[in-house]
Design a protein with these regions (language model features):
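Conserved C-terminal structural/oligomerization subdomain of aldehyde/semialdehyde dehydrogenase
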Residues: 39-44, 209, 232, 269, ...
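ALDH superfamily catalytic-core signature
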Residues: 202, 242-383, 411, 448, ...
Length: 507
């Protein structure tokens, strides 16, 4: 483990407060202890930001913004290009640290770093495409257009399940847009954030920059400081619905902006004509991958009654063959849950599901023989969409429901408070298009013959209802990090008014 930490410039006690290459601050005297969820062993410690240091970080980001916004966007893109290249050099050690600190399997940890690289590549191209529209003026000798300006220093508050990728979705795009970023990572995964800050600092030093990418590790008090501060025009928050509501309300009181990525109770509909082999593989990846701790994890399976028993048998057989164990070991497909609290939440959900008429088809047992936070992934057949099915439990529980007709399938699919990701498996063009239509899925992401997880960075990521409505990553999500300005230029020698208005001498 020491060799891995050395590659990432990590030591037994690390500062969690930084404003750039020469901006590491000592942090609080009460460190956050990072533990390995696989073994329960201590990895290292991080000193969190004090209130005064959080303010210092905000001031540094604010000062840097005034210079950074003046740099041409394509030049900012070159900086982000070099950040992506620096991440390429350290893909394996950083990915393994993600696995060590969070518990997802090694392939997923490395894949998460690849996601960071991909979004940097996307942002580089975007830096030359921050387009505004040109409009025809109704007045002669006038031109109208719109342009986009950066907002300012932003707060990015991320969750444990994607400890580095979600930061990059925000930071890479915000940076090419001309914003500076303050990162408050999850208390469960502070080391990955410190490692990324070291990598970013190396790139910033090459350009003589500071205050562009900033770090403030800490508990909820650091998050509250960021959300309450009017110097930060935008807060991007990824986490629970409960905390997301508080963030949204707090920022709204000061009329700031938010990007909220909250709960996801994602469903797959399996039509009677579906390719069940393809569906089984997608469901397994969506429900078991990352031990069911993705925002886009498959949590509900809505299957036509004609194929439900057959698909259930296939899934039970597949679940019983899932290799559970050390996420750094070759061949493992499911590692641990992140904390003992998560294990307890899974057990409570299963108990409630049975009380509500559910039948556990397979799994659900804790596996202390493997480590403190290991569980077996569970499939629970439910008689209907009961209260526990409508909740999001961040664990590998898959609820299986059946439907008789299309209207019932859509009603079940949309009948939850969340609206992040969705999918259907069908070989019918008509059924697929119905699912994608306005009368079909009500989610921000809707897929056909592919699961709910594994979104590409080229599309905007986010959802509706209690998912929060925010959009990150690709497409035109960049507009959320900028302010729109409409411009009118009069190049004539007259002063015609809009709508043909006559004012003053002209009667």
């Amino acid at each position: 483990m020491k060799s891995l930490l050395d590659k990432l410039n990590l030591v037994p006690l690390n500062s969690g407060v930084c404003t750039g290459p020469d901006g590491w601050l000592p942090g609080s005297t009460e460190p956050i202890i990072s533990t390995n969820p696989t073994t329960g062993e201590v990895i290292a410690a991080v000193s969190p930001a004090t209130p005064a240091q959080t303010d210092q970080v905000i001031r540094a980001a604010q000062t840097a913004f005034h210079t950074w916004r003046q740099m041409p966007a394509p030049r900012r893109g070159l900086v982000v290009r070099d950040l992506g290249n620096a991440l390429r050099e350290l893909t394996e050690p950083l990915g393994e640290l993600v696995t060590l600190e969070m518990g997802k399997i090694r392939a997923e940890g490395i894949g998460e770093v690849q996601e960071m690289i991909d979004i940097c590549d996307f942002a580089v191209g975007l830096s030359r495409q921050l387009y505004g529209l040109t409009m025809h003026s109704e007045r002669p000798g006038h031109r109208m257009y719109e342009q986009w300006h950066p907002l300012g220093p932003l707060g990015v508050i991320t969750a444990f399940n994607f400890p580095v990728a979600v930061w990059s979705w925000n930071a890479a795009i915000a940076a090419v847009c001309g914003d500076t970023v303050i990162w408050k990572p999850s208390e469960l995964t502070p080391l990955t954030a410190v490692a990324v800050q070291h990598i970013a600092n190396r790139v910033m030093a090459d350009y003589g920059l500071s205050g562009i990418f900033n770090l403030a590790v800490g508990d909820g008090s650091v998050g509250r400081t960021l959300t309450e501060d009017p110097r930060l025009p935008l807060i991007s928050f990824t986490g629970s619905v409960r905390t997301g509501r508080l963030v949204g309300e707090t920022v709204a009181r000061r009329l700031g902006r938010t990007i909220l990525e909250l709960g996801g109770n994602n469903a797959i509909i399996v039509a009677p004509d579906a390719n069940l082999e393809l569906a089984t593989r997608a469901i397994l990846f969506g429900a078991v991958g990352t031990a069911g701790q993705r925002c886009t994890s498959t949590r509900r399976l809505i299957v036509h009654e004609d194929v439900a028993d057959h698909l259930a048998d296939r899934l039970v057989n597949a679940y019983r063959q899932v290799p559970i164990g050390d996420p750094l070991a070759a061949g493992t497909l499911m590692g641990p849950l992140v904390t003992a609290t998560a294990v307890a939440a899974m057990q409570r959900a299963l108990t409630q599901a049975v009380a509500e008429g559910g039948e556990i088809l397979t799994g659900g047992q804790a596996r202390p023989d493997l480590g403190p936070h290991f569980v077996e992934p569970a499939i629970v057949r439910m008689p209907t969409q009961t209260p526990i099915v409508r909740e999001e439990t961040f664990a590998p529980i898959l609820y299986l429901l059946t439907y008789a007709d299309w209207e019932e399938a859509v009603r079940l699919h949309n009948g939850v408070p969340q609206g992040l990701s969705s999918a259907i498996f069908t070989d019918s063009l008509q059924t697929a298009e119905a699912f994608l239509s306005v009368a079909g899925s009500d989610c921000g992401i809707a897929n056909v013959n592919i699961g709910t997880s594994g979104a590409e960075i080229g599309g905007a990521f986010g959802g509706e209802k209690e998912t929060g409505g925010g959009r990150e990553s690709g497409s035109d999500a960049w507009k959320g990090y900028m302010r729109r300005q409409t411009n009118t230029i009069n190049w004539s020698r007259e002063l015609p008014l809009a709508q043909g208005l006559k004012f003053g001498d002209e009667t």
